[in-house]
C-alpha cells in the first residue's frame, strides 16, 4: 500500500491508524477530519508529503514519530490542541500557523510560552529554558541526544512524562525548588546523568522517572 485517499466520511484518524505502514508514501486527508490520534502515522518511513487540512483541531502524541522521509509539516490555523509531542523523533521542517502555539528557534511552545511542547534543535549541547515556562511537556526533550547542559528556571512547577527520556548526554541537573512533580520516565535512559539535586518541594516522582540513570546510591 503506497497511496491512500481517506474518504470524506472519516472525521477522526485514530491512534496508531497508519502506524508502521512503511510503504505508505502518499496520503490525502479530507477537510472533514478533525483529529489525528497518538502515533497515527508513526514509523511511516516512506511518507514524503502530508497536508493537514484546516478542519483538524487536535494532533496526538508521537503522531509523526520516525517519519524519516517526511520533509515538512504545517500546523494549520484550526489546531487548538497538541497532545504530548506529536513531532518526537521527527527532524523535518515545521511551520506553525495556529495562533494557539508559538514556534521559535526550533522550540514549540503554547501561545503564552508557559509550556514547552517540543524542543527540536537536535544539535545543540546547551539550553536555558525561558523564565515564562511553568511546564515541561510530555516528551518535550525526548531523545535530544546532544543536549549535555540544561538550566531549568524557578518558574517551572512540573516536568512531564518522558520529558528528557533518552537525553543520553545530559550530565548534571539542578531541579529548582518550584518543581512539585516529576512524572513517569521523565529522565529515563539519561545514562550520563551522574549529578542531580531534587528539592524538598517535589511531592510526586513517577514510576521509572530515573530508570537507567547513572546516579549514586
Kindly give the residue locations of the regions a language model identified.
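Structural signature of tandem-repeat unit edges
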Residues: 1-12, 22-35, 45-58, 68-81, ...
Amino acid at each position: 500500500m503506497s497511496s491512500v485517499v481517506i474518504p470524506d466520511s472519516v472525521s477522526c484518524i485514530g491512534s496508531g491508524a497508519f502506524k508502521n505502514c512503511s510503504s505508505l508514501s502518499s496520503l490525502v486527508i479530507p477537510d472533514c477530519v478533525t483529529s489525528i490520534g497518538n502515533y497515527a502515522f508513526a514509523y511511516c518511513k516512506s511518507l514524503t508529503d502530508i497536508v493537514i487540512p484546516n478542519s483538524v483541531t487536535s494532533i496526538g502524541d508521537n503522531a509523526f514519530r520516525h517519519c524519516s522521509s517526511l520533509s515538512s509539516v504545517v500546523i494549520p490555523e484550526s489546531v487548538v490542541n497538541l497532545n504530548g509531542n506529536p513531532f518526537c523523533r521527527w527532524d523535518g521542517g515545521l511551520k506553525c500557523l495556529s495562533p494557539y502555539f508559538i514556534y521559535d528557534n526550533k522550540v514549540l511552545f503554547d501561545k503564552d510560552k508557559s509550556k514547552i511542547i517540543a524542543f527540536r534543535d537536535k544539535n545543540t549541547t546547551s539550553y536555558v529554558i525561558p523564565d515564562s515556562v511553568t511546564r515541561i511537556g510530555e516528551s518535550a526533550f525526548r531523545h535530544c541526544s546532544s543536549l549535555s547542559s540544561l538550566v531549568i528556571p524557578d518558574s517551572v512547577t512540573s516536568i512531564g512524562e518522558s520529558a528528557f527520556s533518552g537525553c543520553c548526554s545530559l550530565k548534571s541537573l539542578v531541579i529548582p525548588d518550584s518543581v512539585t512533580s516529576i512524572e513517569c520516565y521523565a529522565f529515563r535512559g539519561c545514562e550520563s546523568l551522574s549529578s542531580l539535586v531534587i528539592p524538598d518541594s517535589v511531592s510526586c516522582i513517577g514510576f521509572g522517572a530515573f530508570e537507567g540513570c547513572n546516579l549514586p546510591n
